[in-house]
UniProtKB/Swiss-Prot annotation:
Keywords: Cytoplasm, DNA damage, DNA recombination, DNA repair, DNA-binding, Endonuclease, Hydrolase, Magnesium, Metal-binding, Nuclease. GO terms for cellular component: cytoplasm; Holliday junction resolvase complex. GO terms for molecular function: crossover junction DNA endonuclease activity; DNA binding; magnesium ion binding. The active site is at 7, 68, 141. The lineage of its organism: Bacteria, Pseudomonadati, Acidobacteriota, Terriglobia, Terriglobales. Homodimer which binds Holliday junction (HJ) DNA. The HJ becomes 2-fold symmetrical on binding to RuvC with unstacked arms; it has a different conformation from HJ DNA in complex with RuvA. In the full resolvosome a probable DNA-RuvA(4)-RuvB(12)-RuvC(2) complex forms which resolves the HJ. It holds the Pfam family RuvC. PROSITE patterns: RUVC. NCBIfam families: PRK00039.2-1, ruvC. Mg(2+) 1 binds at residues 7, 141. It comes from Koribacter versatilis (strain Ellin345). Binds 2 Mg(2+) ion per subunit. This is Crossover junction endodeoxyribonuclease RuvC. The keyword Protein biosynthesis does not apply.
Length: 166
């Protein structure tokens, strides 16, 4: 299964595509980030995210896309901007004819590290280890996107095993 993870951010929107082979080994197909200039108007940032995510999806052909659930932010303005980014990311996925799976941040950390309250650096280190990468992906949004994809792969594999036993 090939899964794309997206980590929505107002400075960088990270993406990563992870594939699980028939032995349940994970492979990073591509990872990167859409860099957003602080000087650009919001509508230009959103258009750039849309174009670049559509391009990655079309080029690498994931089966499903996973995105983190909305979390509560202290600053309402920041939360609203992230909501815009998340909406555009979901629109790009829908435009490419794929479905979106969403996961709570706690679920992503649990699936990758085994502990829902893991520190960001622990998640990043485990992503590098699980994908056999020479170093932790940068910026952090890229590692987060890969973690979201890994979460979906682990979750769907568990559900498949449960249904097979039923």
């Amino acid at each position: 299964m090939r899964v794309m993870g997206i980590d929505c951010g107002s400075e960088y929107t990270g993406f990563g595509i992870v594939e699980s082979d028939d032995r349940a080994r994970l492979h990073c197909i591509v990872a990167g980030a859409v860099h957003l200039s602080a000087r650009d108007p919001l509508e230009n940032k959103l258009a750039k995210i849309f174009r670049e995510l559509c391009s990655v999806i079309r080029e690498h052909d994931p089966e499903v896309v996973a995105i983190e659930d909305v979390f509560y932010a202290v600053n309402a303005k920041s939360a609203l901007k992230l909501g815009h980014v998340r909406g555009v990311a979901m629109l790009a996925v829908a435009e490419c004819g794929l479905r979106v799976a969403t996961y709570a941040p706690l679920a992503v950390k649990s699936a990758v590290v085994g502990y829902g309250k893991a520190e960001k650096c622990q998640v990043q280190a485990m992503v590098a280890r699980l994908l056999n990468l020479p170093q932790v992906p940068e910026p952090a949004d890229v590692a987060d996107a890969l973690a979201i994809a890994i979460c979906h792969l682990h979750t769907s594999a568990t559900l498949t095993r449960m249904h097979a036993k039923a």
